[in-house]
Each structure stands twice: as C-alpha cells, then as structure tokens.
Amino acid sequence: MSTYTRPVMLLLSGLLLLTLAIAVLNTLVPLWLAQEHMSTWQVGVVSSSYFTGNLVGTLLTGYVIKRIGFNRSYYLASFIFAAGCAGLGLMIGFWSWLAWRFVAGVGCAMIWVVVESALMCSGTSRNRGRLLAAYMMVYYVGTFLGQLLVSKVSTELMSVLPWVTGLTLAGILPLLFTRVLNQQAENHDSTSITAMLKLRQARLGVNGCIISGIVLGSLYGLMPLYLNHKGVSNASIGFWMAVLVSAGILGQWPIGRLADKFGRLLVLRVQVFVVILGSIAMLSQAAMAPALFILGAAGFTLYPVAMAWACEKVEHHQLVAMNQALLLSYTVGSLLGPSFTAMLMQNFSDNLLFIMIASVSFIYLLMLLRNAGHTPKPVAHV
C-alpha cells in the first residue's frame, strides 16, 4: 500500500493553503498593531491570546473528532480560522484583536490536531516517519511562501484580509473530494494526555517541546517587531522571516538523518547549543543573515527531534495521546514565551528577545547534559 495515498495527498494540499494564510497573518499582525501605536506589551499579549486559543483548540479537538469525524472537524477548524481572519477587519483595537486572535488560535490548533491525527491513523509503524516528514515539510514550505508573499504584495490590512480569508476557505476544497477514516480510534480511548505528560522516560522530549514553543513563539510573535524597531521595512521583514523559515526547511532532512544515525540525545544537545550561538550572533549584529540561518536551522528542527525522543518511549497504541501531549506542551511554551519576553522588551531592551531565547535554551542544555541514560530501541518509528 502506498504511503502517500489519495486522502493523504489531498489533506496535505489543503494544509499548504492554510499554512500560507497562517504564516502571512502571524507576520503582519504584530506590525499592524505597531502601526496603531500599541505598546510592545500589548503586542505580546495579543500574540499570547493567539497561543491561548491554540491551547483551547488542542484540548477540544479530540472530542470534536470523536463526535463528527476527521473531514467535518477539518471543515469546522477552517471556518473558525477564517472567521478569526475576517474579524480583524471589523474593528481595529486592542480588545477586539485580542478576541479575534484567540478565535484564530483555536481554529489553527484544531487544524494541526486534525491533520496530525489523520496522518497518524492513516499510517503504520513502517511509514509514519515519512508521513510526519511530509507534514513538517508542507508546514514549513507554506510558512516560507507566506513570508515571501509578505515581501511582494501590499501589507495594508484591508488589502491582505480578503485574499487571506479566501486562501483559508480554499484549503477546504481538497478534502471535499475524499474521506479520511479514523481506523484506529478504538486503540486510543484508554490513554490520557495527563498520563503521557507524567511519563518519566519521556520527560526530556516533553521539556524539549515546551522549550521549542518558547523559542518559536517568541520568534514568530516578536521577531517582526524587533526588526521593525531596528528600522527595517515591512517588505524586508518578510524577507528576513523567509530566511529564518527557509533554514528550518533545509534543516529538516539532514538533522532527521543525523538523529537516526547518532542518536537523538546527541543531536538535541548540538541543536540547543547552536540556538544559543545564533542568539549571541544576533545580539552582536555583525552578520544577521548567517545568524538568522543557523537560528532557524536549529530552532525550527528542535520540535520534531524532541517529539521523536518522546514518541519512541511509548507503545504503538499510545502514539496519538503522546502526540497530543507534546502539542499541548509546545502550545504552553508558545503561550508563555511571547508574553513574558514582550514585557522584558518593553521594560528594558529589544535585545532581551535573544537573551531570553539563549537563557531557556541553556537551561534545556543543562537538562540534556545530565545522565539521561542510554536511548532504548524505539518502540515505534514516528
């Protein structure tokens, strides 16, 4: 049986369009807030509202899938995100956008959980790795193309919202021509997310997802603002964000191969060390292009390696629950990162963005350098 079946290909096609829309908004919303003369802490709180929506969406989606299935859950998630996009144009203000970004966050998280769970249930232990790799590549390619769009088109609010909302709705179309079946739902009923979070042998993976959420949440939410405060134009900000994301795309395959060959613990240690080096290089402002590139290559690949570390510690029937627990951990990090970092930037200096990233990475590096024991043979290849 082919790994990339018709439902999988159509699902990933729809995801590409949705990711494109999500990437454009994640870059431009902080800039639109800054243009409305909102303070740095308000920008950070709006970013955290989005990630709070991610948290709520992650918790709700399992129940939604069980009730209405993958296809209709996907449609619902897309409509919720489209509403969050269109709502930004109804009223411009801190409280209004706080609410609409929360709605968008719920829809976004539901999309991720539906797609990831559908891929997990469509695959087997022999091909889940390839499905997950395809998913990550589509996600980052969509994000990269979104950043390029920002650098090429008008970034005015009312110019962007119509076509971004249209892209979101267009992402529904591919799944109208197929049906994704939940063939393994019965195997996962008895496994709770809480049990996965408490699993001692998977703790380094869970902690890695939290740290990854802090790092990427801060970069996505506050890097455009950091560049804006440095006098960089909106078009150039889109270019630099594209550099950051393209590094993450290029790093996926080689880092995954290195993790398989030399072990995930060693690769995680090197990745976190490189994130620290990239943050220090950004603080020096000597060479932003290579600094952003190594920061993206290491930071954007941290999540899948940490996720693989945790997933190899559980049985086959626990994989979906562990995946949900890791996404929840990542979301918590994404929620805490922008809010706390924005307050530091507001009260002290914009450079606190990279000091914060380097600090949390150093803490995780200390965890990894402790005696973690030998990595056992993976239970499942994910």
Swiss-Prot record:
Annotated transmembrane regions: 14-34, 45-65, 79-99, 102-122, 131-151, 157-177, 204-224, 235-255, 270-290, 291-311, 325-345, 348-368
GO terms under cellular component: plasma membrane
Membrane topology: Multi-pass membrane protein
Principal cellular location given in the protein's record: membrane
Subcellular location: Cell inner membrane
CDD domains in the cross-refs: MFS_YcaD_like (cd17477)
Gene3D superfamilies given in the database record: MFS general substrate transporter like domains
Family of this protein: Belongs to the major facilitator superfamily. YcaD (TC 2.A.1.26) family.
Disulfide-bonded cysteines: none
GO terms, molecular function: transmembrane transporter activity
Keywords: Cell inner membrane, Cell membrane, Membrane, Transmembrane, Transmembrane helix, Transport
Pfam family, one: MFS_1
Superkingdom as given in the UniProt entry: Bacteria
Protein name: Uncharacterized MFS-type transporter YcaD
